[in-house]
Amino acid sequence: MKEKEIQENMNKSIEATQRNFNTIRTGRANASLLDRVSVEYYGAETPIKSLATISTVDSQTISIQPFDISCLQAIEKSISMSDLGITPNNDGKVIRINVPPLTEERRKEFCKLASKYAEEGKVALRNIRRDAVDKEKKDEKDGLISIDESRDNQSEIQKITDKYIALIETKLSEKEKEILKV
């Protein structure tokens, strides 16, 4: 694998980890909280953002305005059944969600969840590293590159991996601070 390809793959893993972090509640209303919620719509699981306009009214309220009023009940049901711990209020045209402040216990649970997402991201980075190192070893074995080149490349791959793992650690600590901030 080329260095650029490795970095592209690792950037994708970082982005996926960041998307996971964005779905964790922090006590403030945020439209990305609903990114993981999907709605049963005409027999297919559809992301909520494909069915409605989602906006934040204030720091504690999310507003969901469906493009098709007929799916209002389905959206409400999906939000209620999600693991977000929030209750939707349906007024017949718009669903409003009041995001309650988090309890200390709930904040700690969300910190654990953030740590889990960070670990998944690091595992993905290590898998990319493993694949790249395996390719280097194969090229060395096949005689395409020298032993020294292979070791230099493996060392460079490790440096890139370390850099990206440190980036995930930084993002995790930022997210934990955001979650624990009262």
UniProtKB/Swiss-Prot annotation:
Protein name, as recorded: Ribosome-recycling factor
A Gene Ontology BP annotation from the UniProt entry: translational termination
UniProt keyword 4Fe-4S, yes or no: no
Subcellular location field: Cytoplasm
HAMAP family, A to Z: RRF (MF_00040)
Residue stretches spanning the membrane: none
Keywords: Cytoplasm, Protein biosynthesis
Pfam families registered for this protein in UniProt: RRF
